Structure formats: structure tokens, C-alpha cells
Amino acid sequence: MEVEVVRSGGLAGLRLTWTVEVEDQPDPEEWVLLVERLPWSDTPPAPPEPDRYTYRIRCEPHVATLAERQVTGPWRDLVDRVRDVAEPSRRRADVGGRAAPAQPGAPDAEGPRTTAPSDPTPAPPAPGD
Amino acid sequence: MPQPPVPRESRVRAGIVPPYLLLRIAAAEEHYDVAADAARRSLLRDEPMRELRVEGAHPGLLPHEHTRSATTGRDHDVEAEGEGAPVDAAVPEPAPDRRISDAQGAESLPGHLVRTEGQPATGDVAVDQAYDGLGEVWALFERVYGRDAIDGEGAPLEATVHFGDHYDNAFWDGERMVFGDGDGEVFRGFTQSISVIGHELAHGVTEMTARLRYRDQSGALNEHVSDVFGALTEQYAMGQDAEAATWLIGEGIFTELVQGRALRSMLEPGTAYDDDVLGRDPQPAHFRDYIVTDADNGGVHLNSGIPNRAFALAAVELGGFAWEHVGRIWYDALTGGTLRPNDGFAVFAAATLAAARERYGDVSREVAAVANGWRAVGVEPE
Ligand SMILES: [Zn+2]
């Protein structure tokens, strides 16, 4: 079981990813309990606050996107724990590989998105929209 | 890209520098501090110089500023009527109302109020930098654009410093600007940079005016507007013209361990840093390179590079003080009431062109420069 925390946004727009292999931890049962206790289905979208962090927390089959101010209680416990045991990676999977350049004046030139099905975010409109 | 591990202890506790970073501590002090210190000169001391500057290059500004009063309120459209109007000595000069709080390392807001308007420096660097920086941003908006504070009615400018433990960020929470101290390894305190303070306050102005939705293109525009007024705050405070300006956002925010000049470059997006740990500045400089991503509210801090460059190119083409022409055009577009929260680059570009025509005439250098700026980054106004 893998737990991944991706922190994006922030004034600097820098993205950090922490990944924990639960089986490799000395206390895997505690991790499993912690993950199961999380209110995965109770994460209402929060209005974004400029320059605040966004957290995307994933542990298959669950995924949740939280505004920084929603990272409280058990979510905060999990994030703190992940940050304690894992080193952050600054890999930018979304830069270079997934860019779908939209051509001004040619909205249909926008390529298909390779987004995970769990993500409801619509593609940004072409400038002609 | 290789991922040099960041030692945990150094992430958690500042002051422990990882060995690989020690190897390249730059001997050069750079000129960060010089710029920042110059920009932090006291508001009062700078005032006469500013007014001269403003008066010289844009005769409409000074009278305009003095027509603002209880009766004319915040409406920037009164400028024409104000031209040549006599200065009314009975109208009190507007002044900022700054309130700086200290979160004392906790992630709770607002924290303890530690410095209010008119109080002397506290000796706490972050508190005093925030206070001085807010004064500079207030001065830009009030003296150049006739907008008294975020709401245009002189509401207090609220900021909290020392937020969180080695907190690597600054943000606008809808009511106040919040500044972390940085981890000491990648980031120094976020009050170091006038452009960052201006950036945060401008988020408040956008929220009160065009209300650009913080997602995808409209979100990148929201970010762009904050970078515009952040950069202009610094240029105005330092008396820099478009040629002399760095066009950097957050100069002095990185520690000397980072190979980079700033968080972003408005003129040359993608060139602000290139560092072993942080990687390369990922901002696109042209619309063909627009980044589609789910992170960062749809890449708002990435794609802002595109309109940023359009703005900076227009400013450089016109020369002189950017806050007086392109800054004014952008302010008009932002506050003119035509923009809608979901508007994207093309509509925003059209709004800036319309604002330029309105203020400077259909056939003007200003309109041509703005059009050239957008063309250079591949955005077709509509
Ligand atoms: Zn911002």
C-alpha cells in the first residue's frame, strides 16, 4: 500500500511529492488504521485562497484534494506523518510531458487530456472561449 | 532530473545546511539587500520625490489625487474633471492604516497585534518589513491610481507575520496577507521582497474588483495581476523606469544556497532560477506552451508567465515609468467592470486594449505597445 501526498500551489508554485510505502514502515498496521479512518468521501471543494497550498492525497482506491485549511484532524496527522518519514521529491510530472498547448484562434487544436479519471477538473478554455 | 535528497533535519530545523549545498554557497552577496533596503525607505521621506516624478510624466495624476475626497470617493474616473483643479488644502491627505500581527510560529490567524499605524519600528525585522512594504503598496495604489487601500475606502491593511514553523509561503486568506519565515534553506522570510508584499495585497484588490476565479486561465490572470502590481510597487518605491527594472517577483526570497534570482521573471518567464534542488523555473513565456495541469489550481503560478511577459514587453516598448502607462491601463481593465470571473487570456487582452484606447486614443503608442505585447506571447485579443 502506497500513500502519496502532493503539495502544489503556494506563492512560488513549487510542487512537492512525498511517497510512503506502508509495508516498509515499522508500524504498517497503524498506517492502515490511519488511512481507513480518513473521511475520504467527506471533502467538499473549498474556495481556493490565493497562494495557499493545495494537497492531493492518494491511497488507492482513494484520492482526495484538499485546500490547506482543510488539512486538519486526521488529515493533518497523516500529512505530518508522511512528511516525517519521507523525503519530498520535486518531480514535475505535469511540466513538459503533459502540456497540451492550445492554439489561439484554433480551440480544437487542444489535445486530449491525459488526466486520471478521478480528476473532475475541466481543461482550461482555449483563449477563443 | 536527478533528485538530490533534502536531509530531513535541515528541512525541519533551519540552520543545518546539507553538504551538497555548502559546496556552492555563493561568495557573491548579490544585490538583493541593496534593492530591498532601498525600497524600504520610509514612506514619508519618499513622498516629495514621488509626487514630482508622477507630476512630471503624467500631468493628470497630481490634480486627480487631490480631487479625491469624501465626495469623489474612490472613483478613478474622476481624473478628467480633476485636471488642473486647484488643490484643496482642507481635504486631509489620505494615509494608510496598517495593522501587523504576529502568529508567533503558530498556524493560527490573526495572531497578536504588534504594530499599528504610526507606531515606531518594533525591531522585529519581519514586522517592520511588512509594515514598510504595505506602506509602499498603499502608496502605489493611492497616489498613482487613486485607490485608498484594498477596498478603495481606506480599510485597514492587515498582515500577519511569523506564520507557522519555518513556513515556506505567503498567501492572501481573503482578509489579510500572511507571511511565513521560510525554512532558511530554500526560502528566507517572505517579507524580504516588496514585490511579494505587493503581490499579496493585489490579490485583495482583484477580489474586490474583477474577482477573477482562481483556477485555470482566469486564475493565471489573477496571479498575473498580482505580479503586475507587485513589480510596480517595487519599481515605484525605487523610482525605476521599465528599462532599469528587474521585472523579477520575489527577488531576495531565495537563500544564497539557491541558484536563482527570484521566484519569477515577468520579462523572461522560465529564467528566474535553475537549481539542483528546485529544478528550472517552469513558467511558459508563450501561449503555445500553456501548461495543462490539475495541480496548483490549474497551473495558475505557471501560466501567469504568459500575460506577465505581454505586460513587461509593452512596458519596455513604451519606456519610462511602467506604473504611469501600462500599469494604469491594467488598473483600468481590472477595475473597469467589464471583466467577468471566468474570463481567460483573450478576453483580458481585449480589456487591456479597450482600456488603452479609452485612455490614450485609438492611434497611440500605448495601444500599439499593448497589442504588440499580446501578439508576442501568442494571445489574440477577442
Ligand atoms: Zn498569488
Across the structure, where does each feature detected by a protein language model lie?
Chain B
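Zymogen propeptides/activation segments of proteases
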Residues: 1-195, 207-382
